[in-house]
Swiss-Prot record:
GTP binds at residues 17-24, 81-85, 135-138. GO terms for molecular function: GTP binding; GTPase activity; translation elongation factor activity. InterPro entries: EF-G-like_DII (IPR053905), EFG_II (IPR041095), EFG_III (IPR009022), EFG_III/V (IPR035647), EFG_IV (IPR047872), EFG_V (IPR035649), EFG_V-like (IPR000640), G_TR_CS (IPR031157). The lineage of its organism: Bacteria, Pseudomonadati, Pseudomonadota, Alphaproteobacteria, Sphingomonadales. This is Elongation factor G. It comes from the Bacteria. PROSITE patterns: G_TR_1, G_TR_2. One of its GO terms (cellular component) is cytoplasm. It comes from Zymomonas mobilis subsp. mobilis (strain ATCC 31821 / ZM4 / CP4).
């Protein structure tokens, strides 16, 4: 089956919003109207009548899918769910990566809230073209122009107003369309599906004229000929205006602003028109960049069906009916059922079923094309952030470097019944989120979960309770410290046990040399002349590595050093693999004591985005946390502070930052490197651990 919709008719968009700005209602209404104007596939053959919609309305459709497809004006719109939480920069960045454009929803009463600032800045970083929808204009206290001012002042954007509300709060009944220069009035009884075009009411004419002139002036900046014609007194017609607005939106010179009330079913159709008219298709986006399998050579794929197949898996979801679903955005080529290559893991995967998620049904696909967003069933190896591609033309679209977790907490199930459920739940969550790890503590037998920050673990524990119904007690968060050797050292260690019968004997001579951060433990076998038989050497390495894992000073792993096994001795009868493993353990313990141990702590790269008024407070607070300021910068009209701060000093930071900036600043942090702990702090830690 050939492609139904050409690529320029695709819109891959996300709806970004603060938690209460009405993201779900807006998405739900979009699906309601698009479902109405388009019978979905052959599933109903015209049975998609109003009654089916009313049940949907009673139930209040909640879109659980990570990507939903709908149709409007001969265009195909894929709506990708963007997470509301910002602490997971990984999540947000990944969803922005697969979007081509975005709609930012704002609450008509509250305007631009801190959370909306955050998501906006992320989208700015990734150069995602976007437009704004000021929602909830039917609420008491709603004020459209105040929201427009906030978009200008708080986000530093240039708002281009396309619609004005007619009536406000409980009298809100329609919109003035500035491009077409007419009024749109919704008819109450049709659930917002019917509206009529009228002349602009007398009392709105002056305001509409002023707003329209301002809009045209901003739009004609995009084209010299249009600008000249306008200055000579010729206004551009509606089609020309739309082209100019599209050009400016894609170039991110301004953001179109629309308004309405999704809950009261007003303003959603103009929003859909604007998505089609102004947001980019996959063809408007530069080719997707990647690297070849060597990890070095740059490579790219154009958005075309003729290019080799490439796609990015951006979300893994568990579905009650088909099990695990892998959502992937296809950037190039086409995908049929069969084998694809997971280039990040270098493993082959079989595509058994491909599904397209509609608002209320799923459609099995035989083929999918560039620009599509599909759910794949039955992927065994693929995790979030992996690239899928044609085996004969491999490419890695994104090296998702998932940072090592830096914070850990112990979790204990409350009852015996929770024990098994907890194991399952944690494994499921770890599959969905690669920056989350589960381990069990060697000595205490406790389950330890590790993640990127306090909020990250809080939310995962919360999901465990809500989605998997597991009740658990959670310990206090711990920093994942590490130990390292203070200087090179040579050790000659003999393990000997003779007590009648066969004994144990093994002698090893090793040089240990500290190496640079991130090098790990490297083992070099430099035995000459068979002083230790080949088969015993892995045992020496095993013993040393395992002992390094349990640490020496306060029980954290010793990292980043080289082991050179230079000499040793064995006994024909008494030597065994076990004897050499014990000798390796002893040598490691002795080496750690002789060399001395330095304590290392994780240092985080922290980025704080704050309004200028609080800049001094933010920097002062950073310094008090042993932070080193790397620099400050201006983004839009906010100040960005970058600093390196030890993780141990970042606990509870979010609450403190909120309190002295009144909730207007936000921060993100990522692991940067391990660094030596100052002596006074290390002494405190030792006495605490003891």
């Amino acid at each position: 089956m050939a492609r139904k919709y050409p690529l320029d008719k695709y819109r891959n968009i996300g709806i970004m919003a603060h938690i209460d700005a009405g993201k779900t209602t807006t998405t739900e209404r979009i699906l309601f109207y698009t479902g109405k104007s388009y019978k979905i596939g052959e599933v109903h053959e015209g049975t998609a009548t109003m009654d089916w919609m009313e049940q949907e309305q009673e139930r209040g459709i909640t879109i659980t899918s990570a990507a939903t497809t709908c149709f409007w004006n001969d265009h195909r719109i894929n709506i990708i769910d963007t997470p509301g939480h910002v602490d997971f920069t990984i999540e947000v960045e990944r969803s922005l990566r697969v979007l081509d454009g975005a709609v930012a929803c704002f609450d008509g009463v509250a305007g631009v809230e801190p959370q909306s600032e955050t998501v906006w800045r992320q989208a700015e970083k990734y150069h995602v073209p976007r437009m704004c929808f000021v929602n909830k204009l039917d609420r008491t206290g709603a004020n459209f122009m105040r929201c427009v001012d906030m978009i200008r002042d708080r986000l530093g954007a240039r708002p281009l107003v396309l619609y004005l509300p007619i009536g406000i709060e409980s009298d809100f009944k329609g919109l003035v369309d500035l491009v077409e220069n007419r009024a749109i009035i919704w008819l109450e009884e049709s659930l917002g599906a019917k509206f009529e075009y009228q002349e602009i009411p007398e009392e709105y004419k002056a305001e509409a004229e002023a707003a329209r002139a301002e809009m045209i002036e901003m739009a004609v900046e995009q084209d010299d000929a249009a600008m000249e014609a306008y200055l000579e007194g010729n206004e551009p017609d509606a089609d020309t205006l739309k082209k100019l607005i599209r050009k400016g939106t894609l170039a991110q010179d301004f953001v179109p602003v629309l308004c309405g009330s999704a809950f009261k079913n007003k303003g959603v159709q103009p929003l859909l028109d604007a998505v089609v008219d102004f947001l980019p298709s996959p063809l408007d986006i530069p080719p997707v960049e990647g690297v070849k399998m060597d990890g070095e050579t740059k490579d790219s794929r154009k958005p075309s069906d003729d290019e080799p197949f490439s796609a990015l898996a951006f979300k893994i979801m568990n579905d009650p009916f088909v099990g695990s679903l892998t959502f992937a955005r296809i950037y190039s080529g086409k995908l049929t059922k069969g084998t694809v290559l997971n280039s990040v893991k270098d493993k082959r995967e079989k595509v058994g079923r491909m599904l397209l998620m509609h608002a209320n049904s799923r459609e099995d696909l035989e083929e999918a094309y560039a620009g599509d967003i599909v759910a794949l069933v039955g992927m065994k190896e693929t995790t979030t952030g992996d690239t899928l591609c044609a085996p004969n033309a491999p490419i890695i679209l994104e090296r998702m470097e998932f940072p090592e977790p830096v914070i850990e907490v112990a979790v204990e199930p409350k009852t015996k019944a929770d024990q098994e459920k907890m194991g399952l739940a944690l494994n499921r969550l770890a599959a969905e989120d690669p920056s989350f790890r589960v381990a069990s503590d060697f000595e205490s037998g406790q389950t330890i979960i590790k993640g990127m920050g306090e909020l990250h673990l809080d939310i995962l524990v919360d999901r465990m309770k809500r989605e998997f119904k597991v009740e658990a007690n959670v310990g206090a968060p711990q920093v994942a410290y590490r130990e390292s050797l203070a200087r090179p050292v040579e050790v000659d260690y003999t393990h000997k046990k003779q007590s009648g019968g066969s004994g144990q004997f093994g002698r090893v001579k090793v040089n240990l040399v500290p190496s640079e951060r991130g090098a790990g433990i490297q083992f070099f076998d430099e035995i000459k002349g068979g002083n230790i038989p080949r088969e015993y050497i892995p045992s020496v390495e095993k013993g040393m590595r395992e002992t390094a894992e349990t640490g020496s000073l306060i029980g954290f792993p010793i990292i980043d050093f080289e082991i050179h096994l230079t000499d040793g001795a064995y006994h024909d009868v008494d030597s065994s693999a076990l004897a050499f493993e014990i000798a390796g353990r002893g040598a490691m313990r002795e080496a750690a004591q002789k060399a001395g141990i330095k304590l290392l702590e994780p240092v985080m790269r922290v980025e704080v985005i704050t309004p200028e008024d609080y800049l001094g407070d933010v920097i002062g607070d950073m310094n008090s946390r042993r932070g080193q300021i790397q620099g400050t910068d201006t983004r839009g009209n906010a100040q960005v502070v970058e600093a390196m701060v030890p993780l141990a000093n970042m606990f509870g930071y979010v609450n403190q930052l909120r309190s002295f900036t009144q909730g207007r600043a936000q921060y993100s942090m990522q692991f940067s490197h391990y660094d030596e702990v100052p002596a006074n702090v290390a002494d405190e830690l030792k006495s605490k651990m003891a």
